[in-house]
């Protein structure tokens, strides 16, 4: 029984070897059967490769052209933005100059009236006339400021730290605690914004002081 198994294994090995030999012979035969390319086949292959190269060149050219267009567009936008900034600066300067010019023209009327009042002071001893000229000049100045959005801060009643600045305090029984007693310097607002607080004296009781 053992001898028969060994004989069968040997036959299998011989069969495998034979198949390997046949495969090798077949491969060699296929190699021998391969023929070199003909001139026509070579030309066709070269033509195909050239067409592929030309296609790639065209794609590259289109990409480069698109990049140039984007670069030109970017430069154009950048130039437009720089021009806009220059125009904006010039426009702001022009608006500023026009505002100053407008204010100056309006203020010249006040100056003219003030100079007339000064001339009248030289030739007149009428105190009432002098005071009337001063009041008129002051009235014109306040109207001019108001026309430009500048208004005087109301400095009466209770002290408001948002609009008033306490330079002094006064212990008194005539005013309630934290009431404005006196205005030392008028305050002003421009379009609702405090540009200078009113400097005031504030009343305090004996127990409390303004801080």
Swiss-Prot record:
One of its GO terms (molecular function) is protein homodimerization activity. GO terms for cellular component: cytoplasm. Keywords: Chaperone, Cytoplasm, Stress response. InterPro entries: GrpE, GrpE_coiled_coil, GrpE_head. The keyword rRNA processing does not apply. It is found in: Cytoplasm. SUPFAM superfamilies: Coiled-coil domain of nucleotide exchange factor GrpE (SSF58014), Head domain of nucleotide exchange factor GrpE (SSF51064). It comes from the Bacteria. It holds the Pfam family GrpE. GO terms for biological process: protein folding. Its main location: cytoplasm. The keyword Magnesium does not apply. Residues 1-43 are annotated as: Disordered. Residues 29-43 have a biased composition (Basic and acidic residues). Participates actively in the response to hyperosmotic and heat shock by preventing the aggregation of stress-denatured proteins, in association with DnaK and GrpE. It is the nucleotide exchange factor for DnaK and may function as a thermosensor. Unfolded proteins bind initially to DnaJ; upon interaction with the DnaJ-bound protein, DnaK hydrolyzes its bound ATP, resulting in the formation of a stable complex. GrpE releases ADP from DnaK; ATP binding to DnaK triggers the release of the substrate protein, thus completing the reaction cycle. Belongs to the GrpE family. Homodimer. This is Protein GrpE. The gene is grpE.
């Amino acid at each position: 029984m053992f001898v028969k198994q060994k004989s069968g294994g040997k036959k299998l090995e011989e069969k495998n070897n034979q198949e390997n030999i046949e495969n090798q012979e077949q491969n060699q035969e296929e190699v021998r059967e391969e023929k070199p390319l003909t001139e026509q086949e070579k030309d066709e292959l070269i033509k195909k490769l050239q067409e592929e190269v030309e296609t790639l060149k065209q794609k590259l050219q289109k990409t480069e052209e698109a990049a140039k267009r984007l670069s030109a567009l970017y430069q154009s936008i950048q130039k437009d933005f720089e021009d806009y900034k220059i125009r904006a600066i010039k426009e702001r300067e022009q608006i500023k100059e026009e505002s100053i010019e407008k204010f100056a023209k309006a203020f010249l009327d006040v100056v003219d009236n003030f100079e007339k009042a000064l001339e009248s002071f030289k030739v007149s001893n009428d105190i009432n006339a002098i005071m009337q000229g001063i009041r008129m000049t002051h009235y014109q100045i306040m109207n001019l400021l108001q026309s430009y959005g500048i208004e005087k801060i109301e400095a009466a009643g209770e002290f408001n730290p948002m609009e008033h600045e306490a330079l002094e305090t006064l212990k008194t029984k005539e005013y309630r605690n934290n009431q404005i007693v006196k205005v030392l310097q008028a305050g002003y607002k421009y379009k609702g914004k405090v540009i200078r607080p009113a400097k005031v004296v504030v009343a305090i009781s004996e127990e409390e002081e303004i801080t």
